[in-house]
């Protein structure tokens, strides 16, 4: 199946219109105006080792590609990845780190995120986490091995709002990756 081209909807200023049309192109295989749901686990191959862009839905699927393209446009990003759950996405991001790396995280996080960091990754991956109020002078917690700042805004459960511009500016100054979980805000409210 041919890869879809990125739509030109980034030129549209109205978010409501973008949210309806982002990532949507007619299906190149069938001509369907809306993307079909490909509920298959495997894709036929002409010959062994020669696929048509898809082998298994667990690695890629045309339906998921459209979802990811839509999310990237809504977030004004270059690429998006869809996961089965938020914690699966968080795990993939944290797994970018190496043993001995340090993360500064907001002190008010979703409980599942806190447990993933404090009870699983700190022990299984030897990653050091410092939980602080990122709206204060968190830069005093930056260490030589700090590789990531983890922000949640609005936070869960207290709905604290983080100053993303300030956090990002400090992180860039120290060449630290900033990750922001905006589950509560969505692209509608967090631009």
Model-derived features: positions:
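A broad structural signal for alpha-helix termini and local helix breaks/kinks
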Residues: 30, 75, 124-125
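N-terminal "arm"/small-domain region of PLP-dependent enzymes with the aminotransferase-like
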Residues: 2-61, 67-70
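Conserved N-terminal alpha-helix of the aminotransferase class I/II PLP-enzyme fold
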Residues: 42-91, 95-96, 112-120
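Conserved PLP-enzyme active-site core in the AAT-like
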Residues: 7-11, 21, 80-191
């Amino acid at each position: 199946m041919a890869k879809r081209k990125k739509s030109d909807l980034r030129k549209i200023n109205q978010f409501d219109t973008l949210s309806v049309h982002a990532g949507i192109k007619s299906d190149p295989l069938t001509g369907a105006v809306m993307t079909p749901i490909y509920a298959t686990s495997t894709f036929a191959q002409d010959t062994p080792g020669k696929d048509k862009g898809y082998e298994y839905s667990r690695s890629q699927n045309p339906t998921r590609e459209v979802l990811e393209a839509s999310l990237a446009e809504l977030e004004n990003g270059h690429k998006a990845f869809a996961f089965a759950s938020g914690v699966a996405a968080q795990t993939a991001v944290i797994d970018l780190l190496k043993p001995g790396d340090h993360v500064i995280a907001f002190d008010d996080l979703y409980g599942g995120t806190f447990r993933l960091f404090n009870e699983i990754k700190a022990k299984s991956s030897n990653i050091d986490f410092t939980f602080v109020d990122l709206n204060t002078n968190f830069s005093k917690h930056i260490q030589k091995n700090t590789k990531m700042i983890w922000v949640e805004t609005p936070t869960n459960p207290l709905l604290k709002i983080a100053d993303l511009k300030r956090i990002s500016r400090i992180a860039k100054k120290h060449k630290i990756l900033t990750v922001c979980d905006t589950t509560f805000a969505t692209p509608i409210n967090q631009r």
